[in-house]
């Protein structure tokens, strides 16, 4: 009998801790208006680094280090990738996986209804399936902050983004998310 009670206790205590994890992640997201961070991005083995700012909902500005002054900007509706080579790519944001990653309300709703997975005891992962997109979102197991994502990009490349050195709710310049003009 004691063995059965122990098993029940372990089952309910682990369920509570899983619910508590989700609650902490959701609370962190609710309290976050923007994040400034450094990133390392691996697209099919090609590593790029840089700095980004995300402002919820759906805005992002990234400067890539050592890559022809590459920038990535979303104003909430469109996504532009520009380099000084010159190349200029313009996409409707809603046709990219970033549309979901940059939508805090969407993330919160998905986290509420998705089973989390603990990876190596360090990371909390939510696998989100939406409109033919598979999006893996990762959070830190200690502070419950966003630490990265994995998607398939518009060219069908595996894209893994790790973020670090987060600064939350910084004062941002008004024109940060203005789309650059084509040369």
Where are each of the predicted segments found?
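Sec-dependent N-terminal signal peptides
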Residues: 4-13
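Boundary at the C-terminal end of the N-terminal hydrophobic targeting segment
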Residues: 16-19
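Extended beta-sheet lipid-handling architectures
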Residues: 34-37, 49-52, 62, 161-163
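A short, Trp-centered hydrophobic/proline-enriched beta-strand micro-motif
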Residues: 27-47
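A charged amphipathic helix-loop-strand protein-protein interaction module that recurs
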Residues: 94-113
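Gly/Pro-enriched, hydrophobic low-complexity segments
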Residues: 109-110, 114-183
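A generic structural motif
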Residues: 40-42, 63-65, 82-84, 129, ...
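An acidic-aromatic
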Residues: 52-100, 159
């Amino acid at each position: 009998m004691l063995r059965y009670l122990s098993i029940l206790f372990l089952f309910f205590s682990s369920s509570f801790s899983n619910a508590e994890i989700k609650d902490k992640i959701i609370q962190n997201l609710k309290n976050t208006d923007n994040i400034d961070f450094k990133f390392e991005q691996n697209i099919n083995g090609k590593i790029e680094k840089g700095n980004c700012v995300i402002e919820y909902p759906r805005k992002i500005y990234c400067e890539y280090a050592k890559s022809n002054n590459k920038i990535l900007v979303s104003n909430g509706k469109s996504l532009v990738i520009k380099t000084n080579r010159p190349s200029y790519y313009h996409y409707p944001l809603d046709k990219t996986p970033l549309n979901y990653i940059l939508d805090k309300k969407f993330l919160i709703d998905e986290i509420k209804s998705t089973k989390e997975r603990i990876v190596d005891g360090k990371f909390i992962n939510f696998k989100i399936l939406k409109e033919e997109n598979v999006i893996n979102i990762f959070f830190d197991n200690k502070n419950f902050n966003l630490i990265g994502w994995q998607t398939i990009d518009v060219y069908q490349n595996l894209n893994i983004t790790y973020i670090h050195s987060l600064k939350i709710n910084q004062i941002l310049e008004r024109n940060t998310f203005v789309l650059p003009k084509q040369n």
